[in-house]
Amino acid sequence: MTASTATETLLHKGSGLQVVVGLGQSGLSVAHYLAEQGYQVAVTDNQENPALANKLPATIDIRQFGAIDAELLQQAARIIISPGISLDNVAIAAARAANIPVVSDIQLFCEACTVPIVAITGSNAKSTVTTLVGQMAADAGINVGVGGNIGVPALSLLSNKEMELAVIELSSFQLETVTNLGAQVATVLNMSPDHLDRHGDMLGYHQAKHRIFQGAKSVVINREDALTRPLVSDSLPRLSTGIHAPNKGHYGLITDTAGQTYLARGTERLISADKLKIKGRHNLLNAQAALALGELAGLPLEIMLITLQQFAGLEHRCQYVSTVAGIDYFNDSKGTNIGSTMAAVEGLGAVYAPKDGKLLLILGGQGKGQQFGELSPFINQYVSQVLFIGEDGKQIEQHLRAAGLSDEVSLHQCQTLENAFATIEQVTASSLSQVQAVLLSPACASFDQFDGFVARGEHFSQLVKQLDVVS
């Protein structure tokens, strides 16, 4: 362990020492914020030489690296924990047992923020909806800050003194230490199993997510997912979203006699789904969520609809790549859990099913102990070919077969994306092929073969472009 000041000389907790645990981007933002506020700050991190240590303010000379310093934590007036640090960490648990407050950067942000907050969480689509709402606000001429789990630390937004609205994406890790967020509008977009190794079970995960509703002035609810419904007063303003025709004032979908689907608010048809650049039923829910959040934040509907029509989605999130030889290719490399892949398969599958089209699905990577059999009903309905890649490809195939995968679905062990594309050319060359779209939505982490989901998605897109050149 390295330290520029011995633990024995540190201040006692009654004197206001603020200890930042974890020196990632959020921890660094906390350190700068607290130092600027005039606090005495200490930083501790498990890494011996944290990459961001040289970016700490010079005034912070208490730096305990190599392990989280339990003795240092016991001397804190307040501990600010980074999202990657579990509350079950021995040193953190001991500090909490000693009644030392443990909070996150989000707690500091909501206490300091003086503008309305749009708070967004969910198992999937958080970044898409957060980005979309932020763009809607910007297009409406509002000075908006967008941050949180989306890559920009929330505290850094406070440097914009002209900010009129904050739109923040929140993870369950960030929320588990937040009390009374007080958002102008809050939502849990959807809920599916994720991070259970951290939260223990779905109950713990659900409880963490729903902390977003504490102190909220209004809420948005997904009618299709009972787990998103908050336990809040019936008098609290709320809007809901769903895949069916909505009640008056709420959002949903209306399909006319010709089979055309529209985003709707009550009986009012707002925009045809065909006019949107983002595709799939799940993206229609995302679009509704953004509209509902924007409405409760005071954004004008006409501006939001213009933004929505222009919005092309985010990279690696059901991103349309190209059409080659009549087949559409979609990059959903960010789909690193089964819930995300379910949404992508169902969402895109419903687009091609009316045209008797099927999906070719690329699955695999590091499975994280998930039960992939839950994908079988979705694959049976919308997929004709499954190509497996990565270290857990064979295990995923076993899960699907054991869960009643249809014999009509062809399975291929490909190991790599290069092999997968060779297989794609073979299976789609047949005149009997029903494949109208290829979807990379691995439902797995990527670190067995790539530096991350971005690298995996970029490689997929490059292989598609090579196909395009050849064709």
Swiss-Prot record:
ATP binds at residues 122-128. Pathway: Cell wall biogenesis; peptidoglycan biosynthesis. GO terms for biological process: cell division; cell wall organization; peptidoglycan biosynthetic process; regulation of cell shape. Its EC number is 6.3.2.9. InterPro entries: Mur-like_cat_sf (IPR036565), Mur_ligase_C (IPR004101), Mur_ligase_C_dom_sf (IPR036615), Mur_ligase_cen (IPR013221), MurD (IPR005762). It is found in: Cytoplasm. It catalyses: UDP-N-acetyl-alpha-D-muramoyl-L-alanine + D-glutamate + ATP = UDP-N-acetyl-alpha-D-muramoyl-L-alanyl-D-glutamate + ADP + phosphate + H(+). It holds the Pfam family MurD-like_N. Keywords: ATP-binding, Cell cycle, Cell division, Cell shape, Cell wall biogenesis/degradation, Cytoplasm, Ligase, Nucleotide-binding, Peptidoglycan synthesis. Its main location: cytoplasm. It comes from the Bacteria. One of its GO terms (molecular function) is ATP binding. Belongs to the MurCDEF family. Cell wall formation. Catalyzes the addition of glutamate to the nucleotide precursor UDP-N-acetylmuramoyl-L-alanine (UMA). This is UDP-N-acetylmuramoylalanine--D-glutamate ligase. The lineage of its organism: Bacteria, Pseudomonadati, Pseudomonadota, Gammaproteobacteria, Moraxellales. The gene is murD.
